[in-house]
Amino acid sequence: DVVTVSRGHFFRLKAHQERFARSCARMKLTNPFEAEAEARLLHKLVAKTGLRDAYVWWTVTRGANPRVPADRLHPDRFTNRFYAFVIPYVFIKEDTDRQVGINLMVSRDYIRIPQNAVDPRAKNFCSLDLNMSLMEAGASGAHWSVMTDGNGRLTESPGSNIFILKEGRILT
């Protein structure tokens, strides 16, 4: 998962942790830390950096494959691993770009990974499609990309949420 820290304060850390726990359950991963210990660890990492505005990333991986090939069929036979890092917060676009807007391109060459391939309700880092759509946008002179599903519906933008103002209503 990813959470931001602004002026020394985490943005909705508990909500991010709850989403992370749901994602782990959907992916059959076991977080080696309880929520309180996880929060203490993330706070400690940020404190060690001295950053007041940061991007905090953490994940649980399946871990190395068990030695016995048949054990790969059983999620409980893996030793899941927890990783986290903190880096300075970086805006995707500069203030001037955010004030006037940017040129978005709906990707023609790439679609978002279908939900029957990777459950979109589980936060994951399957991002090759997102990265390729960014390169497509750059090659076309656009500032950023938006992806669709296999039926042409907007899904997401790399590192961004999509909000549409239509007839006075905000859609997401």
What is each of the regions a protein language model found here?
Residues 47-59:
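Ordered, amphipathic secondary-structure segments that act as subunit-interaction surfaces
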Residues 1-44, 61, 70-172:
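Helix-start/capping segments and mature chain N-termini
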